């Protein structure tokens, strides 16, 4: 199941808010539709929204009424700004848009139609490189898993969260393809239940054994020695190895540390933000209180109750055993080793 499809010169995004009940694609005829899809989590996961935004910029370029290069680029900068503001925490979003604009600014072509073609080629490259990166990550990461691996994961870092294959679930997939006996424990991941709705669905679709648990069962699961390792994705990793990921990840990492269970993070180099020295500098998105107070459109809490709804938390590097990338497994000290592996990233 592809979360992002470019077909017949049109972008289609799988509406993940409707999974697993309904498989429905959003037809993105303008860049505003792409921005809304990213904002409302119809497309989500750091690598996926980066690729979606790249294609969104292509859609925007189709809308731009300009005949000269200068006007064309100015209007695209404004569109990139709008798309980049939809979600502040995931660095892949801004990375993909910056890469698209850099490709345009360095292209010698003056003809607007030629520039549009260059943009589509670059968006395709971002998409295809992500799939390839995920497969490489999976290959490196599966080596960390024992032959019989019980893996706990949080949120959804699978094919749905990327251009394809997945980051954390890419590790699981690769292990499964190697013939390892993998059993996934999926945190439901409140408040939007990405683990229940998406991770469980992906695993069931592929025939990989999966057990769904509520978030507050994770500690007891670990205490019963039912978990061999934790593998999660990331929305941003800072230069020192601090990791921003879906809210609740930090708690899982603390529990893993207490129970001496390795906590691994799988993420492409595009998720690593070397401009930030630590997780304290990461902007944390706060979302609509109704995500907490309502479910399926029905209230679950008294009207008027105050709500705090950060979408992400930050796991300090001291709790991370290793970071799995497409260039290999990065071990502590992260500040030194991330700098080495990122020095040549595109």
From Swiss-Prot:
GO terms, biological process: L-methionine salvage from methylthioadenosine
Catalytic activity, reaction form: 5-(methylsulfanyl)-alpha-D-ribose 1-phosphate = 5-(methylsulfanyl)-D-ribulose 1-phosphate
Site note Transition state stabilizer, residues: 155
Active site (catalytic residues): 235 (proton donor)
Pfam families per record: IF-2B
Binding site for substrate: 44-46, 87, 194, 245-246
Keywords attached to this entry: Amino-acid biosynthesis, Isomerase, Methionine biosynthesis
Membrane-crossing residue ranges in chain numbering: none
GO molecular function: S-methyl-5-thioribose-1-phosphate isomerase activity
Pathway in which this enzyme or protein is active: Amino-acid biosynthesis; L-methionine biosynthesis via salvage pathway; L-methionine from S-methyl-5-thio-alpha-D-ribose 1-phosphate: step 1/6
Record bears the keyword Isomerase: yes
Keyword Protease (UniProt): no
SUPFAM superfamilies (alphabetical): NagB/RpiA/CoA transferase-like
Domain of life where this protein originates: Bacteria
Known EC number: 5.3.1.23
Function: Catalyzes the interconversion of methylthioribose-1-phosphate (MTR-1-P) into methylthioribulose-1-phosphate (MTRu-1-P).
Family: Belongs to the eIF-2B alpha/beta/delta subunits family. MtnA subfamily.
Name this protein carries in UniProt: Methylthioribose-1-phosphate isomerase
Source species of the chain: Desulforamulus reducens (strain ATCC BAA-1160 / DSM 100696 / MI-1) (Desulfotomaculum reducens)
